[in-house]
Regions:
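Secondary-structure junction motif
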Residues: 3, 76-110, 166
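A late-sequence structural motif
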Residues: 5, 146-199
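Short beta-strand-centered segments that line the small-molecule binding cleft or hinge
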Residues: 6-9, 13, 27-62, 143-146
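Short, high-confidence coil segments that cap the C-terminus of an alpha-helix
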Residues: 16, 37-38, 125-126
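Short beta-strand-to-loop elements that line the ligand-binding cleft
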Residues: 18-25, 91, 104-116
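A ligand-binding cleft/hinge motif common to bilobed small-molecule-binding domains
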Residues: 34, 44-52, 114-143
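Flexible hinge/capping segments at coil-to-helix
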Residues: 54-62, 66-88
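Intrinsically disordered, compositionally biased tail regions
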Residues: 201-212
Length: 212
């Protein structure tokens, strides 16, 4: 996923319609899109398919964030069993689906946000399991991370309001999919009165949102 490239290509093709990139917490992404605060955005699946269309883009790796002097830094990959003796922090804005339960020992209280949890990891209070992009977003020199196997994964999609599928949104979808300027796919053909079926191929850290 290369938002900077999408922005560059958009500005080359739509010089009179600037594209602005925003950042929003995953929990706020749906309301931002539905409320018209953004035309399209990168969100974590699942989304409410009654109001949002989505195109799955990729599945993100899950990692465990630990202090740089933690014992787990001695291995290249961590298993849930390796966390048995650690307090695993579970922030209220966690984007992972722990159907089988969180590994390790639970904290007495759940941090309000992922950012708060990262501060607690730095203080040596516990470790944190997050998608890779969130580990990078909250990077600190005193922390590092390792891939966590057999953990829930987060799927990321490009999403937009079903009722607001404009030609500009269709053009942006085409850019995300790597289509050339001469491609007619991704935009409703003149006179068909329909919407392209490919918009319905998908089903919500930070989420990126675009506003034209």
């Amino acid at each position: 996923v290369t938002p900077d490239k999408w922005l560059r290509v958009w500005n080359e093709r739509h010089r009179d319609t600037p594209l602005t990139l925003l950042q929003a917490p995953a929990a706020e992404a749906r309301d931002l899109l539905v409320g018209g605060g953004a035309d399209a955005g990168l969100v974590r699946l699942p989304v409410d398919r009654a109001v949002l269309s989505a195109i799955p883009l990729y599945t993100e790796q899950t990692v465990v964030v630990v202090p740089r002097d933690h014992l787990l830094t001695a291995v290249d990959e961590v298993s849930p069993e390796d966390l048995a003796d650690d307090i695993v922090l579970h922030p209220l804005d966690d984007v992972l689906d722990w159907e089988r339960g969180l590994p390790g020992r639970p904290a007495l209280e759940r941090p309000a946000t992922t950012a708060n949890a990262v501060e607690l990891v730095a203080a040596g209070i516990g470790v944190l399991v997050v998608p890779l992009s969130l580990a990078r977003l909250h990077h600190r020199k005193d922390l590092t991370y390792r891939p966590l196997k057999d953990a829930p994964e987060s799927r990321v999609a490009l999403s937009w309001p079903e009722a607001a599928t404009t030609d500009q949104v269709e053009d942006f979808i085409g850019i995300v999919r790597g289509r050339t300027v001469n491609s007619t796919r991704g935009r409703t053909q003149a006179g068909t009165g329909g919407k392209p079926a490919e918009r319905k191929t998908g089903a919500g850290g930070k989420s990126g949102a675009g506003r034209t």
